[in-house]
Curated annotation (Swiss-Prot):
Function: Hydrolyzes ribosome-free peptidyl-tRNAs (with 1 or more amino acids incorporated), which drop off the ribosome during protein synthesis, or as a result of ribosome stalling.
Species of provenance: Histophilus somni (strain 2336) (Haemophilus somnus)
Enzymatic class: hydrolase
GO MF terms held by the record: peptidyl-tRNA hydrolase activity; tRNA binding
Name recorded for this polypeptide: Peptidyl-tRNA hydrolase
Sequence similarity: Belongs to the PTH family.
Alphabetized Gene3D superfamilies for the sequence: Peptidyl-tRNA hydrolase (3.40.50.1470)
Alphabetical keyword list: Cytoplasm, Hydrolase, RNA-binding, tRNA-binding
Annotated site residue numbers, Discriminates between blocked and unblocked aminoacyl-tRNA: 12
Summary of subunit composition and partner proteins: Monomer.
Chain's gene name: pth
Main location: cytoplasm
Catalyzed reactions per annotation: an N-acyl-L-alpha-aminoacyl-tRNA + H2O = an N-acyl-L-amino acid + a tRNA + H(+)
Cellular compartments annotated: Cytoplasm
Annotated signal peptide: none
Amino acid sequence: MSEIKLIVGLGNPGDKYADTRHNAGEWLIERLARRFNFNLSVESKFSGKTARAVISGQEMRFLVPTTFMNLSGKAVSALANFYRIPPEQILVLHDELDLPPGIAKLKQGGGHGGHNGLKDIIAQLANNKNFYRLRIGIGHPGDKNLVASYVLNKPSPTDWQLIDRTLDEATDCIEILMKEGITKATNRLNAFKA
């Protein structure tokens, strides 16, 4: 039985950003949509694309904000408040500079680590950091001054192969989360290396 009621995939809107590292969370939502056969549709009151699906008998909501990354919290808080979903039942899928490609980690709580999407979500949830995060490794450019351009560029073919396998594993682990709970999903994903 899933403790999670809302899964959010972070990214930037528009074709210009679709294949960039910062959109890793949205890439994962797209895989979940294929796996569980749901379609996201734009809902302006939530500033995002949303879907509802019943998976393993559990109602689940999905959200991809259509705001830019640094305003992601507007969409998350609007949907969470409307459906009365507390932060502890939210899973945010996002790119992670501090993990190499081929690695993903699932955890609850923590800071924003400089991630502007997480920073805004925390602010819009009244500084509540207790939501879950699925961190998709994209690697680090090695110099903090290069981070902004790095996350807004496409991964190399080698990195993409690792990220692709990681997204497949993360999709499997989210299915485990829905059927068997967060602990089992966390243990499996956190042990994975592409």
